[in-house]
């Protein structure tokens, strides 16, 4: 009997700018409605999440600005590169997100797209608060300080 693989062989698409531009508060996994050529293109890692965000319209959540390159062998059945893609969430989850976005002025940001059990495409969305310029500068200074400390510790351990 062949063992099933737990982890997918595909590395996820990650939005690296999300942590820099937003203070991420909570995360949520959602399914996404895609066409066949979009799934094949994502398996080839041809997606871009940099400017992707989610919007709630009429009780449904849509992922905007998520760019998936056309599949190279798609032919006439290829998909448009950028279009609103529906996210699959339970009604209570959508209502909770809608309350957070309306009351607290938070935004929904796509942070990761990955394959679950090598079959289904999932999107990790985060509820976040946009950072101001001085917050970004503070984060960069903290990161630089941590790197200096790590570098100093590494060099001091080298000579012992």
Swiss-Prot record:
Q: Name one GO molecular function term.
A: RNA binding
Q: What GO biological process term is on the record, naming one? A: trans-translation
Q: Which Pfam families match?
A: SmpB
User: Is the keyword Methyltransferase in the record?
Assistant: no
Q: Which UniProt keywords apply?
A: Cytoplasm, RNA-binding
**Record keywords: RNA-binding included?**
yes
Gene3D superfamilies to which the protein is assigned, alphabetical:
2.40.280.10
Q: Where in the cell is it found?
A: Cytoplasm
Q: Which InterPro entries match?
A: SmpB, SsrA-bd_prot, SsrA-bd_prot_CS
Question: What's the main place this protein lives?
Answer: cytoplasm
Entry GO CC = cytosol
Transmembrane parts of this sequence: none
* Its job: Required for rescue of stalled ribosomes mediated by trans-translation. Binds to transfer-messenger RNA (tmRNA), required for stable association of tmRNA with ribosomes. tmRNA and SmpB together mimic tRNA shape, replacing the anticodon stem-loop with SmpB. tmRNA is encoded by the ssrA gene; the 2 termini fold to resemble tRNA(Ala) and it encodes a 'tag peptide', a short internal open reading frame. During trans-translation Ala-aminoacylated tmRNA acts like a tRNA, entering the A-site of stalled ribosomes, displacing the stalled mRNA.
Q: Which family does it belong to?
A: Belongs to the SmpB family.
Q: What is this protein called?
A: SsrA-binding protein
Origin species, per record, is Leptospira interrogans serogroup Icterohaemorrhagiae serovar copenhageni (strain Fiocruz L1-130)
């Amino acid at each position: 009997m062949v063992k099933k693989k737990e982890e997918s062989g595909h590395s996820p698409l990650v939005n690296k700018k999300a942590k820099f531009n937003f203070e991420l508060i909570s995360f949520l996994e959602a399914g996404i409605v895609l066409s066949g050529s979009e799934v094949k293109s994502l398996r080839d890692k041809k997606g871009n999440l940099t400017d992707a965000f989610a919007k709630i319209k009429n009780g449904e959540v849509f992922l905007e600005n998520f760019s998936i390159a056309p599949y190279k062998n798609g032919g006439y059945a290829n998909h448009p590169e950028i279009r609103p893609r529906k996210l699959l969430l339970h009604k209570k989850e959508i209502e909770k997100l809608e309350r957070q976005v309306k009351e607290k002025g938070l935004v929904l940001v796509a942070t990761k797209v990955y394959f679950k059990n090598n079959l289904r495409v999932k999107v990790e969305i985060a509820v976040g608060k946009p950072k101001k310029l001085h917050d970004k500068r503070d984060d960069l200074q903290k990161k630089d300080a941590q790197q200096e400390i790590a570098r100093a510790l590494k060099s001091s351990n080298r000579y012992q």
